[in-house]
Amino acid sequence: MSGESGQPEAGPSHAGLDWPNPERNRAGVPGGVIRRAGSQGPRSWIQKVLEQIMDSPRQCVTPSEVVPVTVLAVQRYLLEDEPRDTVPKPPLYCYDVTISDGVYQEKCYLDPSLNSLVYQNILKVGIQMRISRVSCLYNEKRIGQGILCIDNVHCGETSDSISLETPFRNRAHQEKPERPLRGGKSHYLALWNNEDPYGDIWLTDKQPEEHNFSDTKIISLSHLEMTWTNRRNFPALLVRILHKSKLRYYGKPDKKMIEPYQTFLEVADSSGTVSVIMWNALCPEWYKSLRVGLVLLLQDYSVKKSYPFRIQPVPVDPQIKLISTMEICLNLRDPPTNIIIIPEKQVKPEWRLPKLNHRFTTRSELDDMPENCICDVIGLLVFVGRVQRSKKKENREDFWSYRWIHIADGTSEQPFIVELFSTSQPEIFENIYPMAYFVCTQLKVVRNDNQVPKLLYLTTTNESGVFITGHRGQPYTYDAKVKNFIQWIRTKSDSGEQKNMVIGGYYPYPPVPETFSKYSSSIKVESLLTAISEVRKEIEDLQYREQKRIAIQGIITAIKYIPHSSATESASASETLRNANRPSTSQAARVEIQERNGKRHQDDEPVNSQYFQTTSTNLSLSNKIRILQGPHANPVAVPQPGASVQTKGIKPGMPSIFNRRANINANLQGKARKTISDRWESQLWREKKFGLIDHLHYSRVYPESIPRKFMFEHRKFLSDQYNSQPAKYVPPEGRPPKLDDFKSARSLGHFEVTILGLNHEIAIDVAFLPMYCPEDIRTSQIDTLLTSMNYSCAYPQDTTGNDRLPGPRAVAGDIIKAATELDRVHIVGILDICNLGNNKVEVYLHKIYSPENTS
């Protein structure tokens, strides 16, 4: 897709031009006065634009030639207020965009009027774009650095061939550490959140060093608590790290802090535990080198009264005194703190430093754990959702990054469901995939037993940490529950487990309650209901991977079933490579389903009542379709593409509506098939659809919305698809497959649902993506559309024996029949909306409340 934008006629500032000299030796130079280039060597478009700006007195020009350039980096930073700003502005994040014309690279400043292209992930790395207006501005805090400003741009498609070998025209742009083009900040931020350390200012090479304690005076924490108010100089502290928080970025435009970071450490000695706050420039120097369990010697610190509203984490040992009256502060200066990591081999027993006590919980124990209880878990990742974002505060530019994961530990049929927020460990958060052994600490239990389905999941806290590699040698490996998990893993085979692994896609968790009144009391928003006339703005205001849940009122007037297309049911990438000369299993399954379902070619007319009666009759109560309802339901049973899917009660060879249709259409064999579809539309819709003032079309299902069967050999590609867009271009490994090459973990296809506003003036088309499984006696009866449109979990299991599921067409018939029963009924629809980037938005119907369950 492409995006086009451009607001200002001139750049943000105008100043005399004094560009660094871009010599034509493909090496770049550090500075000087620009010179006209000779005719030798390849001609650089960037060079020509700079020469054109030099000749323009307004310093804002339209290039004489507009050619595509490649985007190699999009980097974000906070720009402080200008001196003329008397009223502090909200955070204004700026973007530097590195482009290449094939001859040179150039780091450019993106005019803030174009920031929305980054917010929507339209301007991103790897694409070609055409810059149609540029200007010049200077960083007045640095000598002789003229900056090329992008004022108008047209974003194109992803480039097929990208080279990273072209040099920077200006050598200053490749100096380390990287610095933003404007302002006084020394570093870039992560592109999509403020919690992750990003860039080369974050050091990782701090090593333990032996220390001679003969001349070191050490004070205990309890003694320091009693005497700190009467001291000017504090003796050293010898402590062990028990908890480490994620980073907090507190930068604001009106604050002049160079590196405004903060992190908390909970440390302890034999006398107590206390909070340690690491400030500012110490965070980039030390944060990534410090880990839970290390022993530290702290010298030249400061002490202050503790912040009264901060809640300290639960102590790892309840016998240790919790010191909450003071805090230890570590700074680069005033005074300059000295931190030493003590090697574990030098730690003496007489120091009596506390050991780490993990609180590992098994999945079978989770059902009985109270809300807000803190625990650690270990298990096998069986589902890894896409990275999503939620806004921290309305009308702000700050977001949380999170993803949903499922962890199995062998103690229950149910997995742990974990809401995993970024823990300032991007090297792990962005590289998790199914089949990995996963440890997460300091998780909090979230539960609600008073709603249907019951709510039970875990969420990360400020002190949570994740581990995915390097488990050997970690203190938790000696825990009995960890050893039991390792024993369980040894009984599993990789090939047997892989077929049940799922990655990515739309994941509508947590489920909403069974009544609208409970839903109303469970959410915290200013306006409970969104007018259907406001839905378009709600959707357009979403930023990249931002997911929201809104409620609208309306009337369901039409529904249409869309089976899996050939694209979404194609063979997996590895099967395509291995079985190029023979039909794939999924292809065989498609043929079987098409034959069973009668190759319907003439489905534009509404489904008639005979179809509903036949479908309803053939679905016995004991094998009714059930939509999975939250964590207390059985794992989803997804029929394998090659397996026989048969409606109970229909014997092979028995005439059915499907077989009758197949016979009717047999003479059409060899002709192009239309997409099979079943639909219904109400008389009200026929009367109103041509007189609407607006009809919103948001029912398209994109490949990114489909959860996929995980293939270990393509883990890097699949992980990249469901991670956030990177800030810097990374070349793919070999020839990457396409997302549609991987099998869908859903077996039913989807529905297009039309909801007409209560005033009959505006309608919206949305998608509904159910997944079904055999009846679960632990969940309530699900016989109507009202209860089936709820949370569907991507956790597939094989069907065995007599547990075969009815075919997708039978399920679709049941759902469409339920829709007809809502004709002219006022409902409340819960919509999940998410911006997928690049002008793609998903709008999915999560649940509908009828008048019976709105009270």
From Swiss-Prot:
Provide the protein's localization: Chromosome
Taxonomic lineage is:
Eukaryota, Metazoa, Chordata, Craniata, Vertebrata
One Pfam family of this chain: RADX
Output the Gene Ontology terms for molecular function: RNA binding; single-stranded DNA binding
Q: What is the effect of changing K304E?
A: Decreased binding to single-stranded DNA
Protein name from the UniProt record: RPA-related protein RADX
Q: Where is the composition biased (Basic and acidic residues)?
A: 592-604
Q: Which GO terms describe its cellular component?
A: nuclear speck; replication fork
Which keywords belong to this entry? Chromosome, DNA-binding
Name the job this protein performs. Single-stranded DNA-binding protein recruited to replication forks to maintain genome stability. Prevents fork collapse by antagonizing the accumulation of RAD51 at forks to ensure the proper balance of fork remodeling and protection without interfering with the capacity of cells to complete homologous recombination of double-strand breaks.
Can the keyword DNA-binding be found in this entry's annotation? yes
InterPro entries the record matches:
NA-bd_OB-fold, RADX
Q: Where is this region: Disordered?
A: 1-34, 570-608
Q: Where is the composition biased (Polar residues)?
A: 577-588
Q: Which residues bind DNA?
A: 228-331
Effect after changing R240E = Decreased binding to single-stranded DNA
Entry's Gene Ontology BP terms: negative regulation of double-strand break repair via homologous recombination; regulation of DNA repair
